[in-house]
Design a protein with these regions (language model features):
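Proteins enriched for Cys/Gly/acidic motifs involved in redox and nucleic-acid/cofactor modification
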Residues: 2-198, 237, 252, 275-285, ...
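Conserved SAM/AdoMet-binding glycine-rich loop
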Residues: 81-87, 92, 97, 102, ...
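Glycine-centered loop/turn positions within well-structured domains
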Residues: 114, 151, 196, 261-262, ...
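Conserved, mostly hydrophobic/aromatic
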Residues: 173, 190, 226, 254, ...
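Active-site proximal loops enriched in glycine and acidic residues that flank catalytic Cys/His/Asp
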Residues: 192, 228, 256-258, 294-298, ...
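Terminal RNA-binding accessory module
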Residues: 336-435
Length: 435
């Protein structure tokens, strides 16, 4: 018979790295059953498109909806045969979206995307469940160890979208690490909605320290970096693991949200100002050289000027190595939406956000300047114009500072580690030369 041309499927991923991991698993499955798969096309390239959406806060939802509408239009114009939508937005608003955007052939939630294979007339290959088609540079990968969150923070819709915390079995995670190492991955960004809860459901205790140790034992794992920890009931055994293991980056991404007891209580964070300061002190004492990344929130209902002053003082005092901040966005279905009035005007929220970030910008600049003259181990991510661009163990991809190294006579290899002397810095990035 006539040779069937392989159909191309575009996968478009919006939102966080946890979503990206789902897309990578789906891509591997689609390739296995004979499709040609592309990732993150700006506009439809293939015959079929799958959009993996984000449902986090206002802006992210808008971005997802705009992307769906753009592809829906392409379908109407005949340049796209099939359009499928999955992920957090459709998990949350499945019925509404189906009514609003009828051009979409089918909406899947966050967990039932495997059905897409059947709907395309193919089978889901269960034996490949740890395999992925990486969309990141091939020397690093995100490693998702659990899904969902049992915390009940006032403002957060993530538990509504993702459901209860479900840890992946440790052996399965370790198999995935070995699979990725065999394909050249050296650096693992360990991610979850909430890392510190890992293991409680499966093993009846917090198992993050043990999991990290076991990943650290696997030959070929050069860097392990931890993302999204929760401050209450922190598994302090992790300090020892970070201190003892060379391949565990001295880096912790821990969202603290606020510092005033009034706000922490209203946010239902189950932690106090005193405990927060103590945890930071413990981190710095127990893990010399640790770099802390945090995320803070301004404008949550009930935040007074005094609360905000306390938050600014906190940022000045602690001098976080990395910091992000959000203005409160009311999310339907959350405790805050039901119980509190979203009373702080948008312009006040924005002003507080700007003020906090500008304080941090100064601190970041000073901390970067302190690195000048130091020798650091750097992994090279890419070549851009006149610079090789890399990161130290204190920098996670996409969000953190980078190290820029001028192209010299000697070509550097993407994905290799080099010893670099830091020769200069600006508010954000470092400039280095190969030693």
């Amino acid at each position: 018979g006539e040779c069937m041309k392989r159909k191309t499927i575009d996968i478009i991923t919006l939102g966080c790295s946890k979503n990206l991991v789902d897309s990578e698993h789906l891509m591997r499955q689609l390739e296995e059953v004979g499709f040609h798969v592309t990732h993150d096309a700006e506009r439809p390239k293939g015959q079929i498109a799958v959009i993996n959406t984000c449902g986090f806060i206002g802006d992210a939802k808008e971005e997802s909806i705009n992307m769906i509408l753009e592809f829906a239009q392409a379908k109407e114009e005949g340049s796209l045969e099939k359009l499928y939508v999955m992920g957090c937005l459709s998990e949350r608003y499945l019925k509404e979206l189906a009514v609003e955007i009828p051009q979409v052939d089918k909406f899947y939630g966050k967990f039932n995307w495997r059905e897409l294979l059947q709907d395309l007339g193919k089978a889901y290959h269960d034996e490949l469940h740890i395999e992925r088609t990486l969309t990141t540079p091939k020397h690093y990968a995100y490693l998702k160890i659990s899904e969902g969150c049992d915390r009940k923070c006032s403002y957060c819709a993530i538990p509504i979208i993702t459901g209860r915390h479900v840890s992946r079995p440790m052996e399965e995670i370790l198999d995935e690490v070995k699979y990725l190492v065999a394909r050249g991955v050296k650096e693992f960004q360990v991610i979850a909605q909430e890392l510190t809860y890992y293991g409680v459901d499966l093993y009846k205790k917090q198992m993050l320290p043990e999991l990290v140790e076991r990943i650290s034992d696997i030959p070929g794992v050069e860097w392990i970096r931890l993302h999204y920890a929760y401050p209450a009931h922190f598994p302090t055994d992790l300090f020892r693991v970070m201190r003892e293991r060379d391949n565990v980056c001295k880096y912790m991404d821990i969202a603290l949200q606020h510092i005033s007891d009034n706000m922490l209580q209203k946010m239902r964070r189950h932690v106090t100002k005193g405990e927060t300061y103590k945890l930071i002190e413990q981190f710095r004492e127990e893990v010399p050289g640790i770099h802390l990344r945090t995320t803070l929130m301004v404008g949550h209902p009930g935040e007074t000027e005094a609360d905000f002053e306390e938050l600014k003082e906190f940022v000045c005092k602690v001098r976080f190595d990395r910091m992000g901040a959000f203005a409160y966005s009311e999310e339907e279905g959350t405790y805050a939406a039901a119980e509190y009035e979203d009373s702080i005007p948008q312009e006040v929220k924005q002003a507080r956000l700007d003020e906090l970030m500008s304080i941090q910008q100064g601190i970041s600049g000073e901390l970067s300047a302190e690195k000048v003259g130091r020798q650091m181990k750097v992994i090279i991510d890419r070549l851009e114009g006149e610079y090789y661009i890399g990161r130290t163990e204190f920098d996670s991809p996409e969000v953190d500072p980078e190290v820029l190294i001028e192209r010299g006579d000697k070509a550097l290899h993407i994905g290799n580690f080099y010893h670099v002397e830091i020769v200069n810095s600006d508010d954000f990035d470092l400039f280095g030369r190969i030693i």
